[in-house]
């Protein structure tokens, strides 16, 4: 089960993913986040509460990243936990995302463009 929490910080939409981002909820994730992309080009995914991800979940994150990039925006990740990090490492998906150790570091990386 997955829950999403949305917080606007300046021009950045912080999305906290709580639980498991897996096949059973990946389509819902894509639809929900895509809906928010209409008004928010800069996304920050706080993954501190995400305890599991599978290939469908990775695909959903990549999909959102591509949509954000197509709108001259960006999607960044923060607080990736050890178990999901293994999936990122094995698949080498970490190469296409900016991943930060903290939400504050990720927010700072958006710079003045997102303020």
Give the residues covered by each predicted segment:
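Glycine-centered tight turns that cap/initiate beta-strands
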Residues: 11, 93-96, 102
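Amphipathic alpha-helical interaction surfaces in cytosolic regulatory modules
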Residues: 23-97
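A charged, well-structured terminal subsegment
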Residues: 102-115
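General small-molecule cofactor/ligand-binding pocket signal
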Residues: 5-7, 78, 100
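Short low-complexity stretches enriched in small and charged residues
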Residues: 1-4, 30-32, 54, 107
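STAS-typified acidic loop motif
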Residues: 3-31, 48
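Short, flexible active-site-adjacent loop segments at beta-strand->alpha-helix junctions, enriched
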Residues: 19, 81, 103
């Amino acid at each position: 089960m997955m829950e999403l929490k949305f917080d606007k910080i300046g021009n950045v939409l912080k999305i906290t993913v709580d639980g498991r981002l897996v096949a059973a909820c990946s389509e819902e994730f894509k639809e929900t986040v895509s809906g928010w992309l209409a008004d928010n080009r800069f996304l920050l995914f706080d993954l501190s509460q995400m305890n599991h991800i599978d290939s469908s979940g990775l695909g959903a994150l990549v999909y959102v990243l591509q949509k954000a990039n197509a709108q001259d925006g960006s999607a960044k990740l923060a607080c990736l936990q050890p178990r999901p990090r293994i999936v990122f490492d094995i698949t080498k998906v970490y190469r296409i995302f900016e991943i930060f150790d903290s939400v504050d570091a990720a927010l700072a990386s958006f710079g003045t463009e997102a303020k």
